[in-house]
Amino acid sequence: MADYLLLFIGTVLVNNFVLVKFLGLCPFMGVSKKLETAMGMGLATTFVMTLASICAWLIDTWILIPLNLVYLRTLAFILVIAVVVQFTEMVVRKTSPALYRLLGIFLPLITTNCAVLGVALLNINLGHNFLQSALYGFAAAVGFSLVMVLFAAIRERLVVADVPAPFRGNAIALITAGLMSLAFMGFSGLVKL
C-alpha cells in the first residue's frame, strides 16, 4: 500500500508530467487562460489518461507481447488514445454541451497530447503491473490537472495585474510556468522513486 501511495505522490508532485517531464505543454499553454476551461480540460484529460493507460497496458500485455508485435506499440497506443478521446468527446457532448463548446478544438487535440502517449509508453518502460499502470495514469492526470488549474488561476490574476508591456501575454506566462516548475522542484526531496 505504501508503494502505491509513493507512486501517486511521486507522480503528481515530484515527477509532474508538465513541469518536470515537459509533456503536455500545448494544452498547458493553450487552454489555461480561463479557470473554467482549464478545469474542464483537466477532467477530460484525467479521464482519457487513466482509461488510455489501462487500455494500453491490456493491449500490450495480452496482444502485442504474446504475438511478438512490440514494434507496433507506439502505433497501437496512438489508436487506443484516439478511440478513448472519441469516446470522451461523445460523453462530454451529451453530458455538458457548455463544456463541449468551451473546450472546442482542444478536446480532439487530446489525441495528440504527448502526455497521454507518454504515460502509456512510460508504464511499459517502467514495468508497471495493471494496478500500477492505472494508478500511474491517474496520478499523471491529477498532476496535469493540478498544474493546469493553478496556472489558469494565476493567469487570470495576471490579466488584471500591472505587468510591464514587454512581458504581457505569453512572456509572463512562460516566466510564471518557470516559477511554478521551481516551486515543484521543492517536492523532489519528498519522494525518491
UniProtKB/Swiss-Prot annotation:
Cellular component aspect of the GO annotation: plasma membrane
Protein's GO biological process: electron transport chain
This protein's record includes keyword Metal-binding: no
Protein name, UniProt field: Ion-translocating oxidoreductase complex subunit A
Membrane topology recorded in Swiss-Prot or TrEMBL: Multi-pass membrane protein
Leading EC class: translocase
Function: Part of a membrane-bound complex that couples electron transfer with translocation of ions across the membrane.
UniProt keyword list: Cell inner membrane, Cell membrane, Electron transport, Membrane, Translocase, Transmembrane, Transmembrane helix, Transport
Subunit text: The complex is composed of six subunits: RnfA, RnfB, RnfC, RnfD, RnfE and RnfG.
Stored InterPro entries: Ion_transpt_RnfA/RsxA, NqrDE/RnfAE, NqrDE/RnfAE_oxidrdctase
Pfam families reported in the protein's UniProt record: Rnf-Nqr
Family under the similarity heading: Belongs to the NqrDE/RnfAE family.
HAMAP family listed in its UniProt record: RsxA_RnfA (MF_00459)
Domain of life, source organism: Bacteria
NCBIfam families documented for this protein: PRK05151.1, rnfA
Subcellular location: Cell inner membrane
E.C. code: 7.-.-.-
Residue ranges crossing the lipid bilayer per the database entry: 5-25, 47-67, 72-92, 102-122, 134-154, 171-191
